[in-house]
Amino acid sequence: LKQWELQQLFPVDRYPQLRFFLGDVRDQDRLRRALERVDTVVHAAALKQVPAAEYNPMEFVKTNVLGAENVIQACLDTGVRRVVALSTDKAAAPINLYGATKLCSDKLFIAANNIKGKRDLSFSVVRYGNVMGSRGSVIPFFLNQARKGVLPITDPAMTRFNISLQEGVAMVLWTLEHALGSELLVPKIPSYRIMDVAEAIGPGCEKPIVGIRPGEKIHEEMITASDSFSCIDLGPYYAILPSDGSGHERYDSASCSYSSVDKGFAYNSGSNPDFLSVPQLRELIKQYVDPNFAPF
């Protein structure tokens, strides 16, 4: 369906440079065919529902881990030059299987820079927070539930990072232009409290406490205190570099401007100094999710 919808938006007679493939990252031969004469790859394919991962662990391993390795091998084999893989805050100190598979994927893409040989090829990773309005996320769920007058709250203390789809795309484009390879980039973005999201969407709704789901955290991290020893500040983004020092050498050789973060620095959705207010959340929902939104 997604390929068909894209073909309607970008018909081949008007965009002859585009090709639309059905396939699966589990199928390395199909990946090689799809990547012929391709210079740039943005790897966004993943299974991502946390509870589903706990119940179907090997399916997540096949797509998120083995699929990532298939993408890497196909890029090495076909002459791709730039690869950006999308990650998640759940990959930082993961407590659920989904986060663990994405952490493994991150490590595979970063390590791929060590096996590229003399190819003009770099692999980088970008780590997002919750993409506002994405399928299966809390805001579309609350918008649907608000029509029933009830917003189930997992834990009133819960917080999450927030990024818009447009900001996420801009980060990928920045990475393609500026990244040197081997870095994991982290955006500087605000957090929200789950109770503020509930108040923004359904101030008149009931808000029963139902408990957290399997594999969930109260707060998410994008940079752990252990990461701080190899983390640098690039201005618009943080970058976690390989712990062997090769990333620092690469940035120093390229005369890039950066500063080191304090040892023990951690980037946590609960301790983030930048929180979205209820009015700000309502404006963002109108801007990025539903232009006709009004609180219930």
Regions found by a protein language model. Name each.
Residues 1, 26, 48:
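Adenine-nucleotide cofactor-binding loop residues
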Residues 20, 60, 83, 123-126:
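Hydrophobic/aromatic anchor residues within beta-strands of the central parallel beta-sheet
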Residues 21-22, 62, 155, 209:
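Conserved residues in the N-terminal Rossmann fold of short-chain dehydrogenase/reductase
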Residues 26, 91, 131-133:
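Conserved sequence/active-site signature of Rossmann-fold short-chain dehydrogenase/reductase
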Residues 43, 47-103, 107, 111:
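Conserved Rossmann-fold NAD(P)-dependent oxidoreductase catalytic core, especially the SDR/UDP-sugar
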